[in-house]
């Protein structure tokens, strides 16, 4: 496992690169398969394929390969907000930037168009003007973007406030807290299983263990028991299972390919698990072919630079 010396500017940039590029590549790879494949299908993942969207109910449109989706766009917008606030969480600013993405396609892999939008996120930002706290609104839309907060010294309260801009139910908020702790422990050099158990121990609220009794030692579960839906607990379990299942998924490529082969919400699960895998195995573990096929590399590198300046000397 890679251990990052946060006294070193080079290692801070390497950690930022792992999160930004590890997530974007997983997102772009998974986007072409979201709800288009079934578990057990034979898939050639050597190159990315384009995603399909519906501009009208009966009019599908194929987008170019390599585009990343709302998962990465909202992460980039969050990093931009944190950069403007010198690392502080500013929920009004976050909401404004996410709205700019939704309405004008800012922070998007496709100029002028928001690629992929979740229902809860859209309602919270464009209709309600506040986060949705219904138990039925526990999608993975805040978990998918929370990773920068793991690296910028955000408190658990700050992580939950950021989630609540769109996803305000306690389950979604605490899932974000748990994942941030997992990323921090991985960055310290802990092995994935140790990092996951320590992350669960750092969460001061029992709600996750109330809604899921499978989180501890989740790597012991067979694949048939892993659900790859957009429900935040399913996503959290799937990502933790992929990253901690070290005998089967022992590098970045294996983790992300495993995420896509689970089918279902392939882009988000590959994005979130890909961030953690790149932190654990280093950004150099991301296959160069996938990197070269990922949209807007200059923007991603700029975001890496932004995030690296926000990482404190100790997480």
Label each residue range with its predicted role:
Residues 1-315:
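Structured, active/binding-site neighborhoods that engage oxygen-rich ligands
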